[in-house]
Amino acid sequence: MIDLKKFEVWFVTGSQHLYGPETLEKVAEHSREIAGGLDATPQMPVRVVFKPVLTTADAVHELCREANNAAHCIGLVTWMHTFSPAKMWIAGLKALQKPFLHLHTQYNRELPWATIDMDFMNLNQAAHGDREFGFIGSRMRLDRKVVVGFWQDLEVISELGTWARAAAGWHDAQHLKVARFGDNMRNVAVTEGDKVQAKIQLAYSVDGFGVGDLVARIHAASDRDVDHLVSEYEDTYTLSEPLTAKGKQRASLLDAARIELGLRHFLKDGNFHAFTDTFEDLHGLNQLPGIAVQRLMADGYGFGAEGDWKTAALVRTMKVMAAGLDAGTSFMEDYTYHLENGGLVLGAHMLEICPSIASGKPSCEIHPLSIGGKGDPVRLVFDSQTGPAVVATIVDVGERFRMVINKVNVIPPEVPLPKLPVARAVWIPEPNLAVAAACWIYAGGAHHTGFSLCLTAQHLQDYAEMAGIECVLIDNDTTVHACKNELRWNDAYYRLTGWR
């Protein structure tokens, strides 16, 4: 399980010695109260830790270096309670290697109109102190998040929580290892990409393995462990008749359990948290992994089909960002359309949709698979939960990585789907199918996505800014004309600024 409470964001307040010890004591007192208040809110997924008020360039530099080396620190929240000359922040911000959020707030919500004096004015200077700090961030061309409002307002707290989830995803990516069993599906373009640049830009590493390495782990699984896992299947899911104890295809369920055990051991021993496979490279396997992949995703692993390592890493990052939230997150594919009444997307895949998005108890079934040349694979079948969701992809467009996001609304299937033997989700894309699909195609978005009913576009946008990658959002405000222009402008911007 993914526990975000092991992570910290440090609450860092800037000031200067000009104001004297009494004022600085009040600055520290207020800052400690704000940090504690944010830490106690349910919207904050990580710990908020107060740090001593910074009043010198050396103190700023030391704290930023300390943050870089602190394993559990995922970023800073900065606030200038008083005026803090920004030149003293330059060395520290140049050294800082973790994301930071600039909280533009003040301790008091209202002005004490009848009693306000210069003591109050000299203490509560964020209105201009934060502008000074904002200038140096812009002057240094630093990517950061700016949140404005009173620190106790729900909207402000929610923005901070969203950013913290993105920071947790970015922090996880710094150590993320993706295992690829086999290569890409042959001749497919969008699943390719520059793994060296991914390591430089997105931090994670991608390692390839022959399927035989996995097969050896699968064969090593004990019969006792297989029986125990099958018993868990029986307790958790509704087994179709062929997979029951006396069913004709019970052996396939045992094979599926053995595959899951082998995969788990391989990933755990290698400290991998995302993986890919491909139906074109199954030598030594009796079936394409189905239920094994689904259950691993439910436990927080990222997955990409047909060798799609970028989507595998993205799904893992989205899993981390979504930890502790209701609803689920999954690998997904835009599979087919319903083109009446504005259009619907039926999202699915051959097997590998995460049961965290299931609307009810999944059914464990076995059906033929016409590709791969192996036995019938076992999979979980269900309809998705409904409600607002996002689909997102990261593609390599040659000189940079691009994230494409589409806001969608998941609805129940218009009629039951008794003959469709895979998990599925039906959604209406924003603003509609025609515009969303056209813009997605113009942007070069992949057919594989990360799908989430609990994350928002803002989570993903915050992550993209931390990673320094292009981000294209398709929502109710999008038009094809504006999207094409945005893509042109982005292309010019990234060419002028260089491949980061």
Swiss-Prot record:
EC number annotated for this UniProt entry: 5.3.1.4
Entry note: cofactor: Binds 1 Mn(2+) ion per subunit.
InterPro entries on file: Ara_Isoase_C, AraA_central, AraA_N, AraA_N_sf, Fuc/Ara_isomerase_C, Fucose_isomerase_N/cen_sf, Lara_isomerase
Domain of life: Bacteria
SUPFAM superfamilies: FucI/AraA C-terminal domain-like (SSF50443), FucI/AraA N-terminal and middle domains (SSF53743)
Example GO BP: L-arabinose catabolic process to xylulose 5-phosphate
Residues annotated as binding Mn(2+): E306, E333, H349, H448
Recorded GO CC terms: cytosol
Pathway field: Carbohydrate degradation; L-arabinose degradation via L-ribulose; D-xylulose 5-phosphate from L-arabinose (bacterial route): step 1/3
Catalytic activity: beta-L-arabinopyranose = L-ribulose
UniProt cross-references to Pfam families, sorted A to Z: AraA_central, AraA_N, Arabinose_Iso_C
Cofactor (UniProt): Mn(2+)
PANTHER family with a match to the protein in the record: L-ARABINOSE ISOMERASE
HAMAP family listed in its UniProt record: Arabinose_Isome
General function of this protein: Catalyzes the conversion of L-arabinose to L-ribulose.
This protein's name: L-arabinose isomerase
